[in-house]
């Protein structure tokens, strides 16, 4: 950050891989976590920007243990836990049947990422993957994600950071 006097201020460093790195991995076929571990262990990576090609479209949703209307945390035990699968479907999770979702920590249960050649195909694949996902025992954001994926403004890419405020009637 640079102020009106020309002085610079340091805001933050994220010495970690961002949660969204999975989208980059899906469209490039590059394992960023593996590369990070190799760099941290002193290995020289000979990968160049020109070696990385973008292919297709990926979408990630966070499957949080939250009420889909109020977004309030939903702690509890997962009585049933079934994750989707198939080509172009990735699930990154720590949750399992019997997992106790605590009330005092991050509500993330899993990241669901899909890849397909086009955005429309990715949306269709994500809708199918969400309908295949079964998480019983806590509320989740699955109904909200399903509503967003079917909503016209989202499908037409007419979205801003105010999307949820502007679409309070999704659920």
Could you tell me what each predicted segment is?
Residues 1-171:
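ATP-dependent carboxylate activation and anion-phosphoryl transfer catalytic cores
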């Amino acid at each position: 950050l640079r102020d009106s006097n020309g002085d610079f201020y340091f805001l933050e460093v994220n010495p970690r891989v961002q949660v969204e790195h999975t989208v980059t991995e899906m469209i490039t076929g590059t394992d960023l976590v593996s590369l990070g571990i190799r760099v941290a262990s002193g290995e020289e990576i000979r990968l160049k920007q020109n070696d990385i090609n973008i292919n297709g479209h990926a979408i990630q949703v966070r499957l949080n243990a939250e009420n889909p209307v109020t977004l309030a945390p939903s702690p509890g035990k997962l009585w049933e836990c079934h994750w989707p699968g198939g080509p172009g479907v990735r699930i990154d999770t720590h949750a399992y049947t019997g997992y106790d979702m605590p009330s005092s920590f991050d509500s993330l249960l899993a990241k669901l990422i899909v890849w397909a050649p086009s955005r429309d195909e990715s949306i269709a694949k994500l809708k199918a993957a969400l309908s295949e996902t079964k998480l019983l025992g806590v509320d989740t954001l699955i109904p909200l994600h399903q509503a967003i994926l079917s909503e016209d403004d989202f499908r037409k890419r007419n979205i801003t950071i105010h999307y949820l405020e502007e679409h309070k009637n999704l659920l």
